[in-house]
């Protein structure tokens, strides 16, 4: 079976989340093949259970897997529930990769995160630096569980010849995100807070100083390069999927883009008594650039405007 010409059954775990919905939209708009894409929801299968995972793989019979499912949360939830973040993600990842091997999946691409990189490091970080030191203490439960995917990918390849690899996106945002005020990530959390501040005619309070820097990638851009990785990337080592270092932006500037997009007229107040987390996690996308020379990304102003509009249009049903 050749990977690109034969009909494939591609299982996307975590298919109803932010990245899964981005991939679903991208595939609908661009895929001209006979591939069958299955976007798994958490209600379809409990990936923390080996038995449940096996029976789902038996039913779907995937030839390829994009593994997105994870227990995720924002800074404060990661700090509070380290045991749960570690154990649940270890179980999910172990079950998915074990079933990929058992059911002879041709290729599995898992999703990691830049928070897995060492806290004390040189910048920009690249794919070779993952295991050079401990991650930031604020999310070590989640980060160590995610690092183990890279360890398992190499082990499965060495021992069984499995083609398991991973990508490392920087901070993802876009439609279908989790807009929970304390448990979501920075952009969706700020969009929701701005919406409520406008509704209640209040000022907007932002946790921390607003100084930390991040590289943000729009979920639809990430979807394009995730599918490219599934079709074209042949290495077992992870691949960073990110905008360039020059596109790093402060949380304060992101907040301003959101308030502009939503036409918020109140004051921005930075609550400096709250933790900032890591100051920066600058990632290099040179490896991706070398593989995809015509790399393009949606401008952040446009993508944030689209994300804000999606939340306003879908306020009643959005995850929050």
From Swiss-Prot:
<keyword id="KW-0521">NADP</keyword>
<dbReference type="InterPro" id="IPR036291">
    <property type="entry name" value="NAD(P)-bd_dom_sf"/>
</dbReference>
<feature type="site" description="Lowers pKa of active site Tyr">
    <location>
        <position position="146"/>
    </location>
</feature>
<dbReference type="GO" id="GO:0050577">
    <property type="term" value="F:GDP-L-fucose synthase activity"/>
</dbReference>
<feature type="binding site">
    <location>
        <begin position="14"/>
        <end position="20"/>
    </location>
    <ligand>
        <name>NADP(+)</name>
    </ligand>
</feature>
<feature type="binding site">
    <location>
        <position position="276"/>
    </location>
    <ligand>
        <name>substrate</name>
    </ligand>
</feature>
<comment type="similarity">
    <text>Belongs to the NAD(P)-dependent epimerase/dehydratase family. Fucose synthase subfamily.</text>
</comment>
<feature type="binding site">
    <location>
        <position position="193"/>
    </location>
    <ligand>
        <name>substrate</name>
    </ligand>
</feature>
<comment type="function">
    <text>Catalyzes the two-step NADP-dependent conversion of GDP-4-dehydro-6-deoxy-D-mannose to GDP-fucose, involving an epimerase and a reductase reaction.</text>
</comment>
<feature type="binding site">
    <location>
        <position position="146"/>
    </location>
    <ligand>
        <name>NADP(+)</name>
    </ligand>
</feature>
<dbReference type="Pfam" id="PF01370">
    <property type="entry name" value="Epimerase"/>
</dbReference>
<dbReference type="InterPro" id="IPR028614">
    <property type="entry name" value="GDP_fucose/colitose_synth"/>
</dbReference>
<keyword id="KW-0560">Oxidoreductase</keyword>
<feature type="binding site">
    <location>
        <position position="214"/>
    </location>
    <ligand>
        <name>substrate</name>
    </ligand>
</feature>
<dbReference type="InterPro" id="IPR001509">
    <property type="entry name" value="Epimerase_deHydtase"/>
</dbReference>
<protein>
    <recommendedName>
        <fullName>GDP-L-fucose synthase</fullName>
        <ecNumber>1.1.1.271</ecNumber>
    </recommendedName>
</protein>
<feature type="binding site">
    <location>
        <begin position="169"/>
        <end position="172"/>
    </location>
    <ligand>
        <name>NADP(+)</name>
    </ligand>
</feature>
<feature type="site" description="Important for catalytic activity">
    <location>
        <position position="113"/>
    </location>
</feature>
<dbReference type="GO" id="GO:0042351">
    <property type="term" value="P:'de novo' GDP-L-fucose biosynthetic process"/>
</dbReference>
<dbReference type="GO" id="GO:0016853">
    <property type="term" value="F:isomerase activity"/>
</dbReference>
<feature type="binding site">
    <location>
        <position position="185"/>
    </location>
    <ligand>
        <name>NADP(+)</name>
    </ligand>
</feature>
<keyword id="KW-0413">Isomerase</keyword>
<comment type="pathway">
    <text>Nucleotide-sugar biosynthesis; GDP-L-fucose biosynthesis via de novo pathway; GDP-L-fucose from GDP-alpha-D-mannose: step 2/2.</text>
</comment>
<feature type="site" description="Important for catalytic activity">
    <location>
        <position position="115"/>
    </location>
</feature>
<feature type="active site" description="Proton donor/acceptor">
    <location>
        <position position="142"/>
    </location>
</feature>
<keyword id="KW-0511">Multifunctional enzyme</keyword>
């Amino acid at each position: 079976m050749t990977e690109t010409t034969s009909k494939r059954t591609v299982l996307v775990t975590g298919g109803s989340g932010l990245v899964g919905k981005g991939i679903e939209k991208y595939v609908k708009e661009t895929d001209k093949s006979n591939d069958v894409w299955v976007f798994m929801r958490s209600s379809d299968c409990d990936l923390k259970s080996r038995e449940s995972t096996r029976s789902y793989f038996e039913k779907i019979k995937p030839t390829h897997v994009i593994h997105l499912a994870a227990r995720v949360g924002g800074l404060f939830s990661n700090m509070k529930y380290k045991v749960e973040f570690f154990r649940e993600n270890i179980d999910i990842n172990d079950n998915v990769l074990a079933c990929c091997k058992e059911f002879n999946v041709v290729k599995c691409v898992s999703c990691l995160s830049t928070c897995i990189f060492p806290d004390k490091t040189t910048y920009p970080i690249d794919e070779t630096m993952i295991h050079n030191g401990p991650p930031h203490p604020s999310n070590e439960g989640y980060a160590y569980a995610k690092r183990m995917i890279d360890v398992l990918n190499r082990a499965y390849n060495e021992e069984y010849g499995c083609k398991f690899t991973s990508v490392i996106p920087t901070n993802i945002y876009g439609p279908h995100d989790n807009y929970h005020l304390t448990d979501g990530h920075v952009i969706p959390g700020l969009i929701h807070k701005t919406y409520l501040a406008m509704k209640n005619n209040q000022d907007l309070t932002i946790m921390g100083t607003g100084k930390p820097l991040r590289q943000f990638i729009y979920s639809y851009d990430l979807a394009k390069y995730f599918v490219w990785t599934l079709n074209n990337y042949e290495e077992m080592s992870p691949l960073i999927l990110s905008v360039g270092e020059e596109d790093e932006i402060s949380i304060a500037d992101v907040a301003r883009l959101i308030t502009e997009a939503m036409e918020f007229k109140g004051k921005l107040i930075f609550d400096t008594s709250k933790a900032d987390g890591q100051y920066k996690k600058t990632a290099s996308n040179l490896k991706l650039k070398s593989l995809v020379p015509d790399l393009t990304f949606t401008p952040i102003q446009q993508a944030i405007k689209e994300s804000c509009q999606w939340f306003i249009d879908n306020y009643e049903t959005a995850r929050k």
